[in-house]
Amino acid sequence: MSDRGDDVACAWAPSPCQTGRQACLRLLATLIDHAGGDARGLAVFLLDHGDAPSDVRPPARPALDQATVIEVSRRLRAVAPAWNRLLRGDHGEFVVIAQGLVDGGTVLGTAARLVHAFDEALQGAETCVDAEVSVGIAFAPQHDARAEALLAAAEASLREASIRARRGRRKRRPAAPPSDSAA
């Protein structure tokens, strides 16, 4: 990880850029501490394309080239207000940590705009990425207001969203044509 902060995917981070789960946890803990332990209005959005990671396997997703990572980052930053943070997770997912969200409707609206921005960036990529964008969400006070619990809730939500997306793709696949050997 560079100390120069030149990783454009997380250039929105407040200090020398860091990625990964530990950086997300540190940032969440800092934001909660600065709010006097009151995490109300704090939301974590994990955005990914392809299958979500699990504890035993890396995610199954098409790789994003650097130009696409830059474009996804640019579009995600355009959706969220300037006081929010954008980082990259351990498995390449994008993490948006947002403050000042007032209710579940605002959180869901923000999530929809983030997914749309991510999807637009993938569709506009020079190397078109055919993948479903999934989002995992955790929002305080609906989830435990500790940093670890918020991030874990967002990770679980992302896994569930990826499973639903994968099931939906299977249902939409056209039936295989009948084989000639059956005749």
Q: How would you label these PLM feature ranges?
A:
Residues A9-A29, G36-V44, G50-R77, L87-H91, ...:
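Conserved long alpha-helical elements within nucleotide-processing catalytic cores of c-di-GMP signaling
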Residues C24-L25, G104, L108-G109, V115, ...:
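Catalytic-core segments of nucleotide cyclases and related cyclic-nucleotide turnover enzymes
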Residues A39-G41, R85-L86, C128-G136, G168:
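Residues at or immediately flanking beta-strands
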Residues H49-A52, L101, A140:
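Hydrophobic pocket-lining residues within nucleotide cofactor-binding pockets
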Residues D48-G50, W83, G89-V96, S134:
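Short acidic-rich active-site patches of cyclic nucleotide enzymes
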Residues M1-P14, Q22, A156-A183:
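C-di-GMP signaling machinery
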Residues E93-Q99, Q123-S157:
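A short glycine-enriched loop-to-beta-strand structural element that forms part of the catalytic core
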